[in-house]
Amino acid sequence: MKIMEPEIKIVNVVVSTKIGDNIDLEEVAMILENAEYEPEQFPGLVCRLSVPKVALLIFRSGKVNCTGAKSKEEAEIAIKKIIKELKDAGIDVIENPEIKIQNMVATADLGIEPNLDDIALMVEGTEYEPEQFPGLVYRLDDPKVVVLIFGSGKVVITGLKSEEDAKRALKKILDTIKEVQEL
């Protein structure tokens, strides 16, 4: 059985950073366009950008989470945009904060239809209950990620910290499927 090398597509990158201390979210809400701040519903300010298409959650502590980016670089662009707007408005912020990837989500198509029942029976670290969820859940230890494998051959990998991790995880999945389907 020949399996082609599937293309990995990064569909979401979540990063975090710290842009300052004790941020006045009411003031920030008036400065930033597309900012929503409803403290009775959520303790952070939500700012949605269209380019790049991301959502930023800004907290009073100065912590910022950026979600929806397709790469770390895209998230960095979004955070730099916000920092520039706040700095231009006279808010004291850290200009070049350290940006850390918290989670990446990738998808791929294996190009085959794996037998999920066989994989669930023969591979440790898997859960498959088709009455509850159509995908097989496969928890890898290295890289430490969760992989959802569907009968169509589509996979979703969560908990990634890098694209390299995505490649390593996909190789392990393919090797495992080859092994199971050869038995």
Curated annotation (Swiss-Prot):
InterPro entries: TBP (IPR000814), TBP_archaea (IPR033711), TBP_CS (IPR030491), TBP_dom_sf (IPR012295). It holds the Pfam family TBP. Keywords: DNA-binding, Repeat, Transcription, Transcription regulation. One of its GO terms (molecular function) is DNA binding. It comes from the Archaea. GO terms for biological process: DNA-templated transcription initiation. Sequence repeats lie at residues 10-86, 101-177. Belongs to the TBP family. General factor that plays a role in the activation of archaeal genes transcribed by RNA polymerase. Binds specifically to the TATA box promoter element which lies close to the position of transcription initiation. NCBIfam families: PRK00394.1-2, PRK00394.1-3. This is TATA-box-binding protein. It comes from Methanocaldococcus jannaschii (strain ATCC 43067 / DSM 2661 / JAL-1 / JCM 10045 / NBRC 100440) (Methanococcus jannaschii). The gene is tbp.
